[in-house]
Amino acid sequence: MFLGTHTPKLDEKGRFFLPAKFRDELDDGLVITRGQDRCLAIYPTETFVEMTREIAKGSVSVKKVRDYQRMLAAGASDTAPDKQGRVMIPPMLRRYAALNKEIVVVGAITRVEVWDATEWEKYSEAQEEAFADMNEEVFAEQ
């Protein structure tokens, strides 16, 4: 499980130090892909494979299914942290999330999200007020 908020820096090669508490779950491999809300999502490889099996069950005759499968797969990059615990984010994904040197790495239970620091600040401030209401809605749906 991924929890917490961290603020590593993105270096000139597009690498950042993965927080130590996330490394055990991601050392065997990870997939970086487009996330929702213009962030990046990082999944353990096994979790990503399970997720894509479910997505692959959708009918390719449905345009939205095709589009989603295509965009998810085209934006995905499989990798592993290097010996120092750094992860390299491909240029295309850095552009998608508008990442600069200042980033925020967020544990989001089943995945790790990587945000541009300014965008994370805007997003989290906007969501803070609605958090209590979200709790009622999320648990009412289960």
From Swiss-Prot:
Domain of life, source organism: Bacteria
Organism annotation: Cutibacterium acnes (strain DSM 16379 / KPA171202) (Propionibacterium acnes)
Any single GO CC term annotated in Swiss-Prot or TrEMBL for this entry: nucleoid
Protein name in the entry: Transcriptional regulator MraZ
Tagged with keyword Transport: no
Compartment annotation: Cytoplasm, Nucleoid
GO biological process, one term: negative regulation of DNA-templated transcription initiation
CDD domains: MraZ_C, MraZ_N
GO molecular function: DNA-binding transcription factor activity; transcription cis-regulatory region binding
PANTHER family the record matches: TRANSCRIPTIONAL REGULATOR MRAZ (PTHR34701:SF1)
Record text on subunit structure and interactions: Forms oligomers.
Gene: mraZ
Keyword list, A-Z: Cytoplasm, DNA-binding, Repeat, Transcription, Transcription regulation
Family: Belongs to the MraZ family.
Domain SpoVT-AbrB: 5-47, 76-119
Coiled coil ranges: none
HAMAP family, per the entry: MraZ (MF_01008)
